[in-house]
A protein has these predicted regions:
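Copper-binding active sites and cupredoxin-like electron-transfer domains
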Residues: 19-319
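Secretory targeting signatures
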Residues: 1-22
Length: 319
C-alpha cells in the first residue's frame, strides 16, 4: 500500500470523533489496512459500518466445543459460533441492532450486551434448541462487552469463553485514519491434563477468580502483529476479567484514550475494569517491537498475555 506522510492536526473531540487544530501536529503514515490475530477477524470500520443499513442483524449460536488455545493446550469451552472470543459486532450510533441467539448447547445459554439500554428481563436464559431475539437502537458510541446471560451462573458461562466485543461507531465525526484491531483479554479457569487438555471451567477456581492462564484474543501464542514506523494503531479493547486490566504498550504511550466523550491524551497505562471496553490509540514511533501487556498481570508473560506489534522482520521476542 502506498504510504503518504501527512500532518494530522488534532484537538479535543466529541465522543470518539476526530477534528483538527493548528496547535498540535503529529506526522503519521496513512496506512489504514486493518490488523488481525489468529482468532479475531478484521474490523469493517466506521465508514463501512455507518454507510450500511440502519438495521443490522447478527446471528449467534451458543456452541459447546473444544477450542485450541495454542502452545499445545485445548479447552472444553462454551462459545458463540465456536470461537473465543466471539465474532465482532459492529454498529453505528442510531442503528437498530437485532440479535438472534440460537442455543445449540446442552445447557441454558443467553445473551447480554452492555451497549443496549433495555429491560434486563430480555436477557433471560434460553433453553437448548430454542432461539431468542433482542432488538434495540444503540445510541451511545463506544467499545462494549457482550456475553452469555444465564441467571445465577452467568459468571461461570462468561469464564467458559462465551463472550465478545461490540463496537458502536459515532454517527457524526470521522475517526482518524488508523490501523484498527480488536483485542479481548480473558482467562481460563481449569487444570490441564498430561496431554494439555482442560476439561472445562473449574467452578471453585472461577469463584475465587484464580485463573490458570490469561490471554489476549483466546490464544496463548499470538503471532506478532506487523506494523510500520509511523503507523497509528487504534485498538478496540475489551477486558473480560478477572479484575482490572492495566493496559500498557511497552515502548510508547497511548496518544489518546477514549473512555467517554473527550479523549485523555498522553497516557502510559490505563485501567480498564472487568466487563468494560475502551478505545486506545498509539503510534509506532520507530523500527522495533512494542508489546501490548496487562501491567498488573506480568506474571503471565510470556504465556498468552502479550501481543507484540513489530516492524519488518524484527523478532517479537526481542523484549
Amino acid at each position: 500500500m502506498n504510504k503518504i506522510i501527512l500532518l494530522l492536526m488534532f484537538c479535543g473531540l466529541p465522543a470518539l470523533a476526530g477534528c483538527t487544530s493548528e496547535k498540535a501536529k503529529a506526522a503519521f503514515t496513512l496506512d489504514t489496512a486493518p490488523l488481525t490475530t489468529k482468532n479475531v477477524d478484521a474490523v469493517k470500520g466506521q465508514r463501512a459500518t455507518c454507510a450500511g443499513p440502519a438495521v443490522k442483524t447478527f446471528n449467534l449460536e451458543a456452541i459447546e466445543t473444544n477450542v485450541n488455545l495454542g502452545m499445545g493446550i485445548s479447552f472444553a469451552a462454551w462459545t458463540y459460533n465456536g470461537r473465543i472470543p466471539a465474532p465482532i459486532i459492529e454498529a453505528c450510533e442510531g442503528d437498530k441492532v437485532v440479535i438472534n441467539m440460537t442455543n445449540k448447547g446442552t445447557t441454558a445459554h443467553g445473551f447480554d450486551t452492555h451497549a443496549m439500554k433495555i429491560d434486563a428481563r430480555h436477557y433471560s436464559p434460553v433453553a437448548p434448541g430454542k432461539t431468542m431475539t433482542i432488538e434495540k437502537v444503540v445510541d451511545t458510541p463506544g467499545v462494549f462487552m457482550y456475553h452469555c446471560a444465564s441467571g445465577p451462573v452467568t459468571d461461570l458461562h462468561i469464564k467458559s469463553g462465551i463472550h465478545g466485543a461490540m463496537i458502536v461507531y459515532p454517527h457524526k465525526g470521522q475517526l482518524r485514519p488508523a490501523r484498527e484491531i480488536v483485542v479481548v483479554e480473558d482467562a481460563v479457569y481449569g487444570v490441564r491434563d498430561d496431554e494439555g487438555f482442560i476439561p472445562g471451567t473449574d467452578p471453585q477456581l472461577a469463584q475465587k477468580n484464580e485463573q490458570a492462564f490469561s490471554m489476549f484474543n483466546g490464544r496463548m501464542d499470538n503471532d506478532a502483529v506487523r506494523v510500520n514506523p509511523g503507523d497509528l494503531v487504534r485498538m478496540y479493547f475489551v477486558n473480560v476479567g478477572p479484575g482490572v486490566s492495566s493496559a500498557h504498550v511497552i515502548g510508547t504511550l497511548f496518544d489518546r484514550v477514549y473512555d467517554g466523550k473527550e479523549p485523555i491524551v498522553g497516557v502510559q497505562t490505563y485501567a480498564v475494569p472487568a466487563g468494560s471496553g475502551v478505545l486506545l490509540e498509539f503510534y509506532i514511533p520507530e523500527e522495533g517491537v512494542y508489546p501490548f501487556v496487562d501491567h498488573d498481570k506480568l506474571a503471565f508473560l510470556p504465556y498468552g498475555l502479550s501481543l507484540a506489534f513489530a516492524t519488518g522482520n524484527i523478532s517479537a521476542m526481542a523484549h
